[in-house]
Amino acid sequence: MNLHEYQAKQLFASYGLPVPRGEVAYNVEDALLVASQLSTSRWVVKAQVHAGGRGKAGGVKLVSSKDELAAVAKSMLGTRLVTYQTDARGQPVNAILVEETCEIDKELYLGAVVDRATRRVVIMASTEGGVEIEKVAHETPEKIFKVVVDPLVGVMPFQCRETAFKLGLKDDQIKQFTHLMMGLGKMFVDCDLSLLEINPLVITKSGQLICLDGKINIDGNALFRQPKLKNMRDVSQEDDRENRASDWELNYIPLDGTIGCMVNGAGLAMATMDVIKLHGGEPANFLDVGGGATKERVSEALKIIVSDEKVKGILVNIFGGIVRCDLIADGILAAVKEVDVKIPVVVRLEGNNAQLGAEILNKSNLNVIAATSLTDAAKKIVAAVSE
C-alpha cells in the first residue's frame, strides 16, 4: 500500500524527522488558508498522486502570490496527472500539498528497503539527491552508501556517523543526520514498511537538514496490525480491478496481453503464463484464486477478468487437491452463465475427479472448451483468440 507525500510527511514528523511546514488542501479555499498560516511569501504546490515524475508533468509548482496559488490550485484539483509512471489516463488529483519554500544548499538521498539477499533492512544514502536512485545505481553505483541493519539492535549511532562522514556532512549536520537516520530505521520497522525514500533530503543554506519529499510503501501483508496506516489508503489511486480482487482475497495483477488467466496457486499461475507465451500468446493478467476455488470466488474472478476490454479469451487452470474437480467444473459453468461470458473459455482440470469434471464441461452447451493438459490448454486458447 502506498501513501501520499503529505501522509508520509505526517509520519516523518511523528518520528521526529524534520519536514517543511505545510498542510494538505482539497479545494482552493483550503489552499489559501494554509498559505496564510505559513511564514514564507512563496509557496510550493504539489499534486498528491501515487506516482513519481510529478515535477516534469506539471504537478509541482512554485507560486509567489495568493492569486497565483488560487489559479494553480484550481488548475490541479479535479484533473488527472499523467507522468512516466502512470498509464495514459493518469492519476486523479483530489488533493494538493501547500508548503513553505526553503533555501537549498545541497540535495542528498536517504532511503530504506527490505533486501532479499541479506534478509535485512538496508538503508541507502547518496550525495546524488533529487535524481532517481535507479539511475544513480546504474551510472555511478559508487555514490551509493549502504548500511545493513541488524534486526536485533536496529540502526546504531556509529553507522549513522559513518554514513554522515561519507556524505560530507560536518559538525551539527552529523548530529542532525544521526537523529534522522535512527528515526527512519525505527519507523521502517514499527510501521512494517517495504520501501521508504527521502529524495531529496536537503541541506538548507542555514545548515539544517529537511525531508523535502517522501515516499512510503507499506507491506500489504502487515496491514492487519497497522490499523492507523490502513485508514490512510486512497483507493482512488489504485486499479479498480485490483481493489475488487483484494476484497475477495484474490491475487490479481493486470498485464498487457489478451488472454485472461485464472489459476489456483501462484507457482502454477506463473507457469501457466509462461506456457501461454511459449505458444505465441500474451497473458492479460496474473490471477491466483488460492485454495478456496468456490463458485462465488470463481464468479468474481471471471467478472474481474472480463472487465478488462483487452481480454479476448480466458484460460482456467485448476489443480483439484482437496477440492474435487467436478465441483469446480460446476462452479465454472455457473459462473460463466452468471457473468454471461461471450469470449472463449478453455479449462484445464487436473487432480481429484478431473475426468468427471472434463465430462461436465464437454456436455455443457456453453462456449467452454475442456483441455487435456496445460500445453493443450495453451494451444487451444491461443488458437481461439487468434480467430
From Swiss-Prot:
Coiled coil: none annotated. This is Succinate--CoA ligase [ADP-forming] subunit beta. Gene3D superfamilies: ATP-grasp fold, A domain, ATP-grasp fold, B domain, Succinyl-CoA synthetase domains. Its cofactor is Mg(2+). The gene is sucC. Substrate binds at N264, G321, I322, V323. ATP binds at K46, G53, R54, G55, E99, C102, E107. Residues 9-244 form the ATP-grasp domain. Succinyl-CoA synthetase functions in the citric acid cycle (TCA), coupling the hydrolysis of succinyl-CoA to the synthesis of either ATP or GTP and thus represents the only step of substrate-level phosphorylation in the TCA. The beta subunit provides nucleotide specificity of the enzyme and binds the substrate succinate, while the binding sites for coenzyme A and phosphate are found in the alpha subunit. PROSITE patterns: ATP_GRASP, SUCCINYL_COA_LIG_3.
